[in-house]
């Protein structure tokens, strides 16, 4: 079986829950040909990516899929691209709030996800859930993590992707119930 390292962030911005990690925890241990290795990561610039890289060095995954919260979205959205910028409107969980800084000095402006984002979005929709491709992972820790991982695994066989999920109903609107978010992630993984 192939190995999928799937991550979810801890709560940030004053929240007490993060639907990304909560949904990851609900996923089965295997989906299709993948064994899932689940990892909670901190919402901290640089540290989130290094936490993923450390785990990847231990387990040697075939695919890394990070899951993050995007409270303003009404769909589960595989990300098409990571961009080489850190620019935070709020501080991360250790108080860092970089503005207009490159993630990798002199690195490419953007790096495309190496997972099949269209097939993943289509699989989510086919499961009867809201799914769409996103063309921006923002400029907060989610994008920082996506870009760092894409840069690190360039020219390797490890595929890297990111999916943003909506708030839970108790967090605000738009939202998606936790069970539906987990079902959407399972559908996306089935399209890898």
Segments (PLM) and residue ranges:
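Catalytic beta-strand/loop cores that center a nucleophilic Ser/Cys/Thr
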Residues: 141
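Active-site-adjacent mobile loop/cap segments within catalytic or ligand-binding domains
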Residues: 144-190
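N-terminal catalytic or cofactor-binding beta/alpha core of small enzyme domains
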Residues: 1-137, 151-155, 175-180, 189-192
């Amino acid at each position: 079986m192939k190995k999928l390292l799937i991550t979810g962030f801890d709560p940030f911005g004053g929240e007490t829950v993060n639907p990304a990690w909560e949904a990851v925890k609900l996923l089965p241990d295997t989906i299709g040909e993948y064994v899932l290795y689940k990892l909670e990561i901190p919402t901290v610039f640089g540290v989130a990516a290094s936490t993923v890289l450390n785990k990847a060095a231990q387990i040697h995954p075939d695919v890394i899929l990070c899951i993050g919260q995007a409270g303003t979205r009404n769909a589960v959205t595989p990300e098409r691209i990571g961009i080489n910028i850190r620019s935070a409107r709020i501080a991360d969980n250790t108080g860092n709030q970089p503005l207009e800084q490159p993630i990798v000095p002199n690195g490419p402006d953007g790096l495309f996800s190496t997972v099949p984002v269209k097939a993943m979005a289509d699989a989510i929709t086919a499961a009867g859930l809201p799914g769409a491709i996103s063309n921006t992972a923002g400029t907060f820790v989610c994008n920082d993590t996506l870009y760092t991982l894409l840069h690190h695994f360039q020219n390797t066989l490890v595929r890297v992707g990111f999916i943003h999920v909506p708030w839970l109903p108790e967090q605000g609107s738009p939202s998606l119930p936790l069970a539906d978010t987990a079902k959407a992630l399972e559908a996306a993984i089935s399209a890898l």
